[in-house]
Amino acid sequence: MIADSSSWLKLTKKVRFGDTDAAGVMHFHQLLRWCHEAWEESLERYGLEAQAVFPGCRGQEQWPAIALPVVHCRADFLRPVHGGDQLSLHLTPQRLDPSSFEVHHRFLLEQQDVAHGWIRHVAISTETRRRSALPDAIERWLEASLIGRISEL
C-alpha cells in the first residue's frame, strides 16, 4: 500500500471530445462516470486490485463476498468544462458508518473549482443482500486517506 496519499487521492483527467455535447462543453452525465472511474483508479494506485473489490473481472475465480452498490450520488456544476481541459481531481473519502462510505470528488481547472461530485456506497453481502461491514481492503483505503488530514473535532 502506498503511504503518500497524494499519489492516489489527487488525480488528473483530460476532457475528451466524446465527453462533450454539441455546445462543446462536458455533458452532465460524464461527471458521475468520472467520479466512479477516479475512485477505481484511486484504489488501484493505492494497491488494491480490481478483482478484490469489483465482480466480473477477468481471471476472477470468485466474486467478492461483499458488494458496494452506489446508493446515492450528486453533482454540482460550477463552471463550464470544455474538450481539451486538463482537470485536477481531488478525492476525499469519508466513512459514514461501519457499512457505508462516501467519496467527495473535487474537479479543478487552473486551481478553480469547476465541479463537485459525491458518490455514496453501502456494503452488502452478495449472498444475503443485507448490509454488512465494509471489506477490510476498503477499510484500509479509508483509514489511509485520513493520514495527514486535519479534521474538525
UniProtKB/Swiss-Prot annotation:
Reaction(s) catalysed (UniProt annotation): 1,4-dihydroxy-2-naphthoyl-CoA + H2O = 1,4-dihydroxy-2-naphthoate + CoA + H(+)
Keyword Hydrolase belongs to the record: yes
EC number: 3.1.2.28
Pfam families per UniProt: 4HBT_2
Gene3D superfamilies the UniProt entry points to: Hotdog Thioesterase
Cell inner membrane in keyword set: no
Active site: 21
Stored InterPro entries: 4-hydroxybenzoyl-CoA_TE (IPR050563), DHNA_CoA_hydrolase (IPR022829), HotDog_dom_sf (IPR029069)
Gene Ontology BP term (one): phylloquinone biosynthetic process
UniProt cross-references to CDD domains, sorted A to Z: 4HBT (cd00586)
Function: Catalyzes the hydrolysis of 1,4-dihydroxy-2-naphthoyl-CoA (DHNA-CoA) to 1,4-dihydroxy-2-naphthoate (DHNA), a reaction involved in phylloquinone (vitamin K1) biosynthesis.
The family this protein is said to belong to: Belongs to the 4-hydroxybenzoyl-CoA thioesterase family. DHNA-CoA hydrolase subfamily.
Protein name, as recorded: 1,4-dihydroxy-2-naphthoyl-CoA hydrolase
Lineage: Bacteria, Bacillati, Cyanobacteriota, Cyanophyceae, Synechococcales
